[in-house]
Regions:
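N-terminal Sec/SRP start-transfer signal
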Residues: 246-282
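Conserved catalytic loops of ABC-family nucleotide-binding domains
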Residues: 193-205
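Conserved signature/switch motifs of ABC ATPase nucleotide-binding domains
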Residues: 147-150, 167-168, 199
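Conserved ABC ATPase signature
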Residues: 148-158
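Short coil-to-helix segment of the ABC ATPase nucleotide-binding domain corresponding to the Q-loop/switch region
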Residues: 108-116
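Helix-to-loop junction immediately C-terminal to a conserved catalytic motif
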Residues: 62
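Alpha-helical transmembrane segments
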Residues: 285-319
């Protein structure tokens, strides 16, 4: 049992995080001793000018970038010794990403785009399809499941990206400028959706739009020069209770799924596939010809022109005067 003064862990805890990008002649401090704790269901907006460290902090939280010093705690567990597999499991099981650029595959339907997020979880095809439909219905796109991204508006594509982020039921949704490429009306629609998402999970959003941030977010964190300059609602350690850790799921993709995705990609880009196959064939034929020629020459030399004496000029290096002829058949000199 915990004592009254014992600190209870938050869901996500950044402790004195530092991150620097070093070049040959310059060092950029992206995060300078950042300490923040997040609740498990709040809508946090990260504000600050360009270069203040907003996106870097989001990448560190999402495991896309690693901190140089400090620590990131998840349910009180340090990530200092996380392996690549641990980070993969963390991103796959607990994080949903929403980016400004949508990152949708153009030759697949939006249903297939959303479904793709489950291919590494070992979920069967029928269940993947069902959950993808449900996620698209939740964002108001249930009637557009067979359309491709180029048949949708910018706001609709961002909704697809949000559905893809939610299909794996993540505990944390990270949104990097989700309204940056949208008009004001569509931005409000996306913000309404994110606010609804934040009712039962943590949403951390980076934005340059303070009006939307103050209107929708439950907490505003301001950054400048890699430091936290303001926090409207800091986490209070005494308000939290220990959360039950969510079991991790093994990351895997079935052979049939991998084969199907590969075949779809090859058939979509037939011209490039044909050119690649043609170039590869030429390379293989060239290597085979070189090996055959090399073996033929070696055999020719070894057999001494079909059994005849192979005479190679040599010199007596002791006198350096008299030429000596080597008899390849007898092994002697004359």
């Amino acid at each position: 049992m915990r004592t009254a003064g014992e600190r209870l862990p938050s869901m996500l805890d950044l402790r004195v995080i530092c991150k620097r990008y070093v070049t040959q002649s310059f060092t950029q401090v992206a995060l300078d001793s950042v300490s923040l704790s997040f609740r498990d269901n709040e809508f946090v907006a990260i504000l600050g000018p360009s270069g203040s460290g907003k996106t870097t902090m989001l990448n560190v939280i999402g495991g896309l970038d690693h901190f140089d010093s400090g620590d990131l705690l998840i349910d009180g567990i340090s990530t200092k010794d996380f392996s690549d597999r641990d980070w993969d499991a963390y991103r796959n099981n607990r994080i949903g990403f929403v980016f400004q650029s949508y990152n949708l595959i153009p030759h697949q339907s939006i249903l297939e785009n959303v479904e793709l997020a489950l291919t590494l979880t070992g979920v069967g095809h029928a269940e993947r399809r069902q959950r993808a439909r449900k996620a698209l219905e939740a964002v108001g796109l249930g009637e557009h499941v067979d359309k491709r991204p180029n048949q949708l508006s910018g706001g609709q594509m961002q909704r697809v990206a949000i559905a893809r982020a939610l299909i794996n039921d993540p505990e944390i949704v990270l949104a990097d400028e989700p309204t940056g490429a949208l008009d004001s009306t569509t931005s409000v629609q996306v913000m309404d959706l994110l606010k609804d998402v934040a009712r039962d999970r943590l949403v951390i959003m980076v934005t340059h739009n303070p009006e939307l941030a103050y209107q929708y977010a439950t907490r505003i964190v301001s950054l400048a020069d890699g430091k936290v300059t303001d926090d409207s609602d800091p986490f209070d350690a005494t308000e939290a209770a220990r959360r039950e850790a969510k079991p991790t799921r093994k990351t895997s993709m079935s052979f049939v799924t991998a084969l199907g995705l590969s075949a779809r990609n090859l058939m979509t880009k037939k011209g490039r596939t044909a050119m690649t196959a043609f170039a590869g064939s030429i390379g293989i034929i060239g290597i085979a010809a070189i090996l055959a020629l090399s073996n033929g020459v070696n055999g020719y030399i070894k057999n001494g022109r079909g059994g005849h004496a192979l005479k190679l000029p040599a010199y007596d290096f002791q006198t350096r005067l008299r030429p000596v002829v080597h008899d390849g058949r007898t092994g002697g000199y004359r």
